[in-house]
């Protein structure tokens, strides 16, 4: 998810 944070997960 492109949450705008540096933490994107599948």
From Swiss-Prot:
Protein name (database record): Vegetative protein 6
Species, as recorded: Bacillus subtilis
């Amino acid at each position: 998810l492109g949450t705008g944070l540096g933490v994107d997960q599948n």
